[in-house]
A protein has these predicted regions:
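Short glycine/proline/serine/threonine-rich loop/turn segments at secondary-structure transition edges
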Residues: 151-153, 166-179, 272-284
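Conserved, compact domain cores that house catalytic/ligand-binding motifs in diverse enzymes
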Residues: 213-265
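Contiguous beta-strand segments within globular domains
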Residues: 74-124, 157-159, 214-223, 233
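Extended low-complexity, serine/threonine- and proline-enriched intrinsically disordered segments
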Residues: 103-141, 234-249, 286-291
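Gram-negative bacterial Sec-dependent N-terminal signal peptides
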Residues: 1-23
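Short beta-strand elements
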Residues: 186-215, 293-340
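Proline/serine/threonine-rich low-complexity linkers at boundaries of modular beta-sandwich domains
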Residues: 57-79, 195-203
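Aromatic sugar-binding surface patches on proteins
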Residues: 146-167, 258-273
């Protein structure tokens, strides 16, 4: 089993478009700041990074659905907003789609332009599901009556649901984008249209729910058992949290796997846990397995509260920085700019 850790993106370019004199004056400060950031980043390996406990779980945050909003002609209100309950679904999953209509905020209105007429409800809301080949999968009717997945009658949030069928599923180990065109129409035939979407994902491997942990070379390693249906490249990512639920570290690992059952390691670098000053037991608060052989990647679900480790003491973990050579070299080059 070959393993290749994922490289994070490096910092953005140091320079913006500005007069040369301004760039020359700003270069030492920007270079020094970037060099310091690189030296801080170099303390940890590319495959295990610290996460501030004050921030949301990065895996869960990355799966939050985006709200798409579209106003009427010439910016007329109300604007139609649409979103889904998740960004990915697999065969047999029930997808929930939501829509609401609301007047534009003051910040989104052009005060110099004549105010267009605002349309009034009630509204009939429908959705058309279309795959990436333009084939219609279904027509959906949204409701706001507190039934069939709609949480509260009359709250202005319209809901539709759809069970992902096997007849339209992508090949195993792949995924395809599905668009949903949402249309709201009132009695005056005023119309609002907005586009949303999701990923119809059919991963080539699944997490089994079995995990085990160990201390290895001063770091915490959690192994996840996976069942692989098709050979390919897979990406495992997980977030480690304290017993109080504070996120501590994000670890990721990319591996090529053949069909069958395998254990895949997530290594959380010990210095992160040492510096956090928090002892175990720790919780694998979120974990997900992605099939990464083709675009778009076939995302797997994010499993929460997946595993609780043994009660390790934080002093059992290494206190040595990882000293990433690529980042230290970059920092040295930037510091050379400051000395000129």
């Amino acid at each position: 089993m070959k393993s290749k850790h994922i490289k994070p993106l490096l910092a953005a370019s140091l320079f913006s478009l500005a007069p040369m004199a301004t760039i020359a004056a700003a270069t030492p400060d920007l270079a020094a700041q970037a060099a310091a950031e690189y030296r801080t980043m170099a303390r940890y390996p590319e495959w295990s990074q610290p996460v501030s406990g004050a921030l949301a779980d990065p895996l869960l945050a990355g799966r939050e659905a985006t709200v798409q909003t579209q106003a009427g002609p010439a910016g007329a209100g109300p604007a139609l907003s649409v979103w889904a309950s998740d960004i990915r679904y697999s065969t047999g999953d029930t997808a929930y789609f939501y829509a609401s209509l609301a007047e534009r905020t003051a910040s989104s209105v052009n005060l110099l332009a004549p105010a267009p007429r605002s349309a009034a409800g009630p509204w009939a809301v429908t959705g058309e599901l279309v795959d990436n080949n333009g084939q219609q999968l279904a027509m959906l009717s949204y409701r706001d009556d507190g039934k069939d997945g709609d949480q509260q009658a009359g709250d202005g949030v319209y809901t539709a649901s759809y069970v992902l069928p096997a007849t339209h599923q992508p090949d195993i180990g792949s995924a395809k984008n599905i668009a949903i065109k949402v249309t709201a129409v009132n009695a005056d035939q005023d119309q609002r249209v907005a586009l949303g979407g999701f990923l119809y994902s059919q991963p080539g491997a699944q997490l089994t729910g079995e995990y085990r942990d160990r201390l290895s070379e001063g770091s915490l390693v959690i192994a996840a058992k996976v069942d692989v249906a098709v050979a390919g490249r897979y990406h495992l990512a997980g977030v480690l949290a304290s017993a109080l639920g504070e996120s501590l570290s994000l670890s990721q690992n990319a591996v090529h796997l053949e069909p069958g059952s395998h254990w895949v390691d997530l290594s959380f670098y010990g210095l992160i846990l040492r510096e956090a000053g928090v002892s175990g037991p720790y919780t694998l608060s979120s974990v997900t397995l992605t099939t990464a052989g083709a675009m778009p990647n076939a995302l797997g679900p994010v499993v929460t509260a997946a595993h609780v480790t043994k009660p390790y003491l934080n002093v059992q973990f290494t206190d040595k920085p990882f000293a990433r050579a690529d980042l230290l070299d970059a920092a040295t080059r930037l510091e050379g700019l400051v000395k000129r």
